[in-house]
């Protein structure tokens, strides 16, 4: 049997998809502004 692919880990999640990471690059900031424009409750993980 192969293991499940999703092994939840909050620290890994934040480091890969977190707000600080999004703010780091221009593209990431574009993602955040798009999500703000759409009216998302959560901007990032």
From Swiss-Prot:
One of its GO terms (molecular function) is structural constituent of ribosome. It comes from Leifsonia xyli subsp. xyli (strain CTCB07). GO terms for cellular component: ribonucleoprotein complex; ribosome. The keyword Ribonucleoprotein applies. NCBIfam families: rpmH_bact. PANTHER family: LARGE RIBOSOMAL SUBUNIT PROTEIN BL34M, MITOCHONDRIAL RIBOSOMAL PROTEIN 34 FAMILY MEMBER. This is Large ribosomal subunit protein bL34. It holds the Pfam family Ribosomal_L34.
């Amino acid at each position: 049997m192969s293991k499940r692919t999703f092994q939840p880990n909050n620290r890994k999640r934040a480091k890969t998809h977190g707000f600080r990471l999004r703010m780091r690059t221009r593209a990431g900031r574009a993602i955040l502004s798009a999500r703000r424009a759409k009216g998302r409750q959560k901007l990032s993980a």
